């Protein structure tokens, strides 16, 4: 196979295989939990997995899990922050867009208040995690990205 002869291609091919295998495991897990009740989902750590996927921006995970168990979309942590809140806090644009485009979710997610009385505007105004800020060199570019992120929420303020 010519994959071994081209530098860099082997690494990409390996990553693609790993992604395909992870997706297959996810689909198997989804088939397994499709009939689970709330306590079984808790025991299977499905709630924690959803929140972690939101924090890390793994939109495929959120899509597949909510396809088999739509109630997982509304899971919250001890601070009453759900998937949407973590997507905002961690600047996970794909997850934000996925949830925001879902029918009937716009009013629910925009009006949600966490345990600290923060709504989505407050969360958007908080500083991004350092791992996200470090993706952009220089304070000016970091500030520009933070401002762009916050401006997304200005038109949505009337929902709050």
Predicted regions, residues:
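Acidic, Ser/Thr- and Pro/Gly-rich low-complexity regulatory segments
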Residues: 1-160
């Amino acid at each position: 196979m010519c994959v071994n002869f081209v530098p860099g291609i082997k690494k990409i091919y390996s990553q693609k295989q790993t992604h395909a295998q992870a997706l297959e495991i996810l689909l198997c897990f989804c088939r397994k939990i499709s009939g689970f009740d709330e306590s079984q989902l808790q025991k299977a750590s499905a709630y924690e997995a959803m929140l972690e996927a939101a924090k890390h921006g793994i939109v495929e995970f959120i899509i597949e899990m909510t396809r088999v168990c739509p109630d997982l979309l509304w899971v919250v942590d001890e601070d009453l922050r759900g998937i949407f809140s973590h997507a905002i806090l961690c600047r996970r644009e794909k997850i934000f867009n996925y949830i925001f485009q879902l029918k009937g979710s716009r009013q629910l997610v925009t009006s949600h208040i966490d345990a600290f009385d923060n709504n989505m505007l407050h969360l958007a105004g908080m500083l991004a995690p350092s791992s996200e800020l470090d993706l952009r060199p220089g304070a000016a570019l970091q500030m520009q990205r933070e401002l762009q992120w916050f401006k997304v929420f200005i038109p949505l303020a009337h929902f709050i």
